[in-house]
Amino acid sequence: MEISTDALIAISIIWGFVFIYAVMATMDFGAGFWSMIYLNKEHMKATDIANRFLSPTWEVTNVFIVAIVVALFSFFPGATFVLGTVLLIPGSMILLLLAIRSGFLVFSNTAKERKTLRYISGISGFIIPAILILVLPVTHGGFIEKTDGIYNLNMSKIFSSPNAYSFIGFAILSTLFLSSLLLADFSNVAEEQDAYRAYRKSALITGPISLLFAVCIMVTMRNEANWLYSGMMNDFSWIIASFITFVIAGIALFLPNKSFGQNIGKPRLALVAIGIQYFLASYAYGRAHLPYMIYPDVTVMSGFTEPATFRALFATYIVAFIILFPGFFFFWKMFMRDKRYIRQEE
């Protein structure tokens, strides 16, 4: 099935939003979890490192989930109707958990019950990725039933699907892996050796487990969504390239780090390699998923908006990007690159 250039641009924009949100959100949610885990180990300052990352980033992360919903609704109204109908309950759960987490993050820096609030924030941040990831297996087919023109999500099939559980495990471990890798880099810049060792160790543990869950996804996908599995096997070179970058990241964590005491590992190099790895893997998955948005009911073309509407929306997105990009760059430079902030220097 051929896909028009306009539809391909639109789906690429949405997939770009999804990828950016997935990476940022996993780091954000994971940082909240690690902040909770190391809360009672004040001598390590691991919680302080996590909070320095969380403080400015969770608000920005929430912006991208709004952008995904708006882009999906505007570019693909046909797909939005089906997804909105079947994901009403899980979507409401996600919004509730995001609201709870955001509220507790706001008050966690001021309230006397700081520990309790951070526990709640950390736990909710641990659950949200597990629910969010279920959108992917739902689009693979087999879980949506149509009765008298009404779409329904068969929850019993989801909770009995090995592929769905593989996705859940992958989401949780990826959250812990990416966040621990980022916080190791933060600790490296902040020159907090105890925190760096803790987060590096966590990355070395959670990384291979997340890869194992990725393998489980492929194995279970072969039985439950063979059309998608076959598509990914046709572009197996992208998966191989993804695995190579994962190995590079692992090697980077064992390279000598002369600029940081006697510690080993180059977390910045590892973080960049893992970012490339997830991009390559997501590209292979997205390419194989075409032309379906929701198999087999909704394709990219059947759910696409009118061409004239797309052109107007696309122009609007370009203008919005031009306006917002300087703000995101300023944010990155102030909080991600400013060593005075990371080290909490006066």
Curated annotation (Swiss-Prot):
Q: Name one Pfam family in it.
A: Cyt_bd_oxida_II
Q: Could you confirm whether the keyword NADP appears in this record?
A: no
Subcellular localization, per the record? Cell membrane
Mostly located where?
membrane
Per UniProt, the keywords (alphabetical) are: Cell membrane, Membrane, Sporulation, Transmembrane, Transmembrane helix
Where does the chain cross the membrane?
7-27, 63-83, 87-107, 119-139, 164-184, 201-221, 236-256, 269-289, 312-332
Q: Name one GO biological process term.
A: sporulation resulting in formation of a cellular spore
Family listed: Belongs to the cytochrome ubiquinol oxidase subunit 2 family.
Q: What is the native source organism of this protein? A: Bacillus subtilis (strain 168)
Q: What is this protein called?
A: Putative cytochrome bd menaquinol oxidase subunit II
- UniProt lineage: Bacteria, Bacillati, Bacillota, Bacilli, Bacillales
